[in-house]
Design a protein with these regions (language model features):
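Anionic-ligand binding patches
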Residues: 1-148
């Protein structure tokens, strides 16, 4: 998806383009919502609705399987040049889901995602700290050589 977006806008503007595609993968849901993470919030990307859908989907699956709250955020960044050259980098942040929303910082699924090695959700963390450990930061560290 990030390649499609970067290619489209680079060709349309004849400029170098950087595109991001990120998503939350939940093990018990076989990687869903994944690249459709924002779509789980409906037409208006309502993440309160998306989070409710996550919890409802997990409850349905729990009845039939051993439970796991493992999850990961994945970000793919793509740089695309007007000459057709491109470079993509992926950042992955493993963690787990909280059993309820915690915190009001950040956006999207931040109130239910706890990064591995931490006890707080992204929604409870100071945004200036979160951005130094998240999946986008990991992807950017791999791609930043094109911007220095």
């Amino acid at each position: 998806n990030s390649l499609i977006k970067a290619s489209y806008f680079s060709k349309k503007t004849n400029l170098v383009c950087l595109s991001d595609d990120s998503g939350l993968e939940i093990d018990i849901l076989n990687g869903k919502p994944g690249i459709y993470s924002s779509r789980w919030g409906g037409k208006r990307n309502n993440f309160n609705l998306a989070i409710k859908k996550v919890f409802k989907s997990i409850e349905k699956v729990k009845k039939n399987r051993l439970t796991s709250n493992k999850a990961r955020f994945i970000c793919c960044l793509t740089v695309f040049w007007p000459n057709g050259q491109s470079y993509s980098a992926t950042g992955i942040l493993n963690g787990k889901l909280s059993n309820k929303k915690k915190g009001n910082k950040g956006f999207g699924y931040d109130p239910i995602f706890i990064p591995k090695g931490y006890k707080k959700t992204f929604g409870e963390m100071d945004p200036s700290f979160k951005i130094r450990i998240d999946h986008r930061h990991k992807a950017y560290n791999k791609i930043r050589k094109f911007f220095i």
